[in-house]
Amino acid sequence: MDASKPLAPYDATTGWTHREASHLLSRAQFGFTPAELDRATNEGMDATLTRLTEVQPESTDFSRAETSLRQAAISTGSIDNLKIWWLYRMRYSANPLTEKLTLFWHNHFATSNAKVNSVPYMLRQNELIRTNAAGDFKQLLHSMSRDTAMLIWLDGNANRKRHPNENFAREIMELFALGVGNYTERDIQEAARAFTGWHVRDGQFWKHELQHDESAKTVFGKTGPFDGNDIVNLCLEQPSCPRFLATKLAKTFVCPEPSQDMINHLANRIHHHDLQMRPVLRELFTSQWFYQLENRQILIKSPLELVLGSLQTLVEPIRWTGVIKVLADLGQNIFEPPSVKGWEGGRLWITSSSLLQRANLATELTTTNQFGPLSETVRHVTTDGSEAIVNVLGRWLLSDSVDDTIRQELLKFHASAEGTADQKLRGLLQLILSLPEYQLH
């Protein structure tokens, strides 16, 4: 990698195989089917990135099923039905990067139905995020500041002229736009006054003029009769904003401990693109930095990445009710993040309890039909010999990342296993899904 140009394009003409395709798909979406891996390998990096970053039309079958699930969530008021609707989108949408980014921002603007207690409000927020997921962060931040679920979550109705509530002002600076250390307590106090009167009425944003403080406030060294919109704009103008976003993007999509130099380079690109995410993401996913060998198989899969990635590759059709439960057991209950900080992820995904649950997941996926049957594509590999089976499963599930010692153990296991071809395949799959290497991407 050219140290002077760390985000220089990766030369895919000399190094694009199923390994690079697998790396991209595992980071930019929730895993892949064998057919998707073949397509990305054959089409190349540029065509694959265009398909991922540009909006693709959804199929008629997808739209029909998605609409039905959405209506079921609304009519029943069931948060579990809303979870099934979103999981279905994550698995079957023609725009998987959009869904991955919707989860990224759901975690960034972490809002829990445990307090909001409204499927329509949570649905509206999710669709608002999706609309702006790969677009203009400025618009997204403005939209979230007026979002009904967010205002309930951070006590907007309690923010009144005589008794300002600092919750939203604090979180927009600490968690949404700037990060710790880039504001003062006085900035928060003054900004809270600017958001007074930003309430919810009849399920909609309502600026309660009688409860809004119209007097002058001083935030980030600037003084004026600011309202909430002005505070959002002031946050977006701070030089720490692109850097804050760069850090989160790098840790989510590239490596757990990016260097300060790399963060600075990425922040400069975010600033260059005026906080527009789509061109930034394309540069990131085509960069030498992204494809460096040391940045592959280094991120711990979140429960969603682990579960959906496994289902994408192995199972069809999927039974969603069991998926909701296992995600909650593994610690990633969508629409119900643990706090305003969201899921911190990384090494925190791995505990003695979660390791046992991940091992149980491998067993349930391969020895029961709790989540659905093995797909026809997967079952078909039983017609091959042990070496061919290990090779194809290694390509689909491990990106050929394991060393030869582990590969030989897998070969030995399959060759010596007793039972039918299907039983031997399931045993091998269970072993692969239990490997430490499978917990990484």
Where are these regions (language model features)?
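Amphipathic alpha-helical oligomerization segments
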Residues: 78-79, 140, 405
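Short amphipathic alpha-helical interface patches used for protein-protein assembly/oligomerization
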Residues: 36, 152-156, 409
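Active-site substrate-binding loop specific to GH73 endo-beta-N-acetylglucosaminidase modules
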Residues: 2-9, 82-86, 118-327, 439
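Flexible, low-complexity segments enriched for small/polar residues
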Residues: 2-18, 22-33, 238, 242, ...
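N-terminal accessory alpha/beta regions
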Residues: 20, 27-132
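A ubiquitous short alpha-helical element
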Residues: 69-72, 92, 110, 156-159, ...
